[in-house]
Amino acid sequence: MSEKTKEKVSLVSLGCPKNLVDAEVMLGYLSQDEYEVTTDETQADIIVVNTCSFIKEAKQESIDTILDLADRKHDARCKLLIVTGCLPQRYQQELAKELPEVDIFIGTGDYPRIAEIIAEKKQTEEQLCYTGDPNFVYNDEVPRLQSSPHYTAYLKIAEGCSNNCSYCVIPSLRGGHRSRPLATLLAEAKALVEGGVKELNLIAQDITAYGRDLEGKPSLELLIKELVKMEKLKWIRLLYAYPDGVTDSLIQLIKEEPKVCKYLDLPIQHISDPVLSNMKRRSGEAEIRTLISKLRREIPDIAIRTSLIVGFPGETTDDFKKLLQFVEQTRFDRLGVFCYSREDGTPAAEMPDQVSERIKRERHKKLMRTQARVSFKHNRTLVDSEEDVLVEGYSEETELLLKGRSSRQAPDVDGLVYITAGNANVGDIVRLKITDSSDYDLIGEIVD
């Protein structure tokens, strides 16, 4: 195929960073197969929507996006609309019936075949659906095409999950936990760093389970120790750490290794033991409190992020009050709150004492208001301190302000630092003095 006749493909990725990596892998396969990648959907011959169906809101966003692009398909040059990921893996038959506008559905196990499936579609008018076993694990030979800014990337160290929490559909959509080989991860990381990446964000459904299923059982700590040897890599961030997998050796590594961000994403989901038990979480209240105390004792400046679920079946008023009080007392640096989503096929969906949507929303609002106060007070304590900040570009509001993130702020989910004085290039890591703060963001000036 000549350069002039290359078909253009655009990919929209929804959901979590793990989905984004899947999207980048698919783009790599397509670019390797002589498709030209474009970010302009109006110029694309083929549009791919990589979907999420983890909770109700994610499913709705995926459906809305598909319908929007299906409408555009009639107005633009798009010839094929492809839906990939968790949504077709879970709802293949329903989607095929309800969305005739979609030409191809591809589940989470068939990403490597995307170019082959497109070629097959060009030989038939029929809608194609491929949703085999979700057991795909990519290696460093897969041509991942990075779509995030050049200075930051996600490194997906494992696929699937074997924790089997009672509310979660991930094992059925992604399969059981499968660690990627250490050599594969190091080769991919090396390529990313040589391409300009300064910040690697390690992700999986549970990063602390890394290596348990591999020969020799290489640990998360070993992976980190190998990554820090890469001279041009400046920050390593740990996301999605299951509480009972956070070992003393991991805590010491975060404490002592300068390249490991003093940051830990630690989803605990709740603090009430009856709720945690019904969720099938392995860590109870005592273990969670002990771990958080240990982290802060060993690493006083660590930023702890967590995720919580409100309105889980059987969550009483007292359970919620306990959670609210816990958030006030614990003072998490970052916090995400989700209303429980009743997902077909999960044990929690069949539990008695389902909580009404109204009460879920009320509890969500109360928890977020509490966290806003906690975050505001914490950010005020940072005024006049200094932070290393990764510059990400100009503020959306004005080009008079640069913006960035400190090592205590993860991409996409945490706040930002706005830079009011000093010059820097995108991708630079600069020293900043914090001069002001808001609920979630910081303001500062570059210091010499």
Curated annotation (Swiss-Prot):
Domain of life: Bacteria
Catalytic activity field: L-aspartate(89)-[ribosomal protein uS12]-hydrogen + (sulfur carrier)-SH + AH2 + 2 S-adenosyl-L-methionine = 3-methylsulfanyl-L-aspartate(89)-[ribosomal protein uS12]-hydrogen + (sulfur carrier)-H + 5'-deoxyadenosine + L-methionine + A + S-adenosyl-L-homocysteine + 2 H(+)
Cofactor note: Binds 2 [4Fe-4S] clusters. One cluster is coordinated with 3 cysteines and an exchangeable S-adenosyl-L-methionine.
Residue span, MTTase N-terminal domain: 7-123
Annotated positions binding [4Fe-4S] cluster 1: C16, C52, C86
Protein's cellular compartments: Cytoplasm
Cofactor: [4Fe-4S] cluster
Molecular-function GO terms, alphabetical: 4 iron, 4 sulfur cluster binding; aspartic acid methylthiotransferase activity; metal ion binding; protein methylthiotransferase activity
Function: Catalyzes the methylthiolation of an aspartic acid residue of ribosomal protein uS12.
UniProt protein name: Ribosomal protein uS12 methylthiotransferase RimO
Gene label: rimO
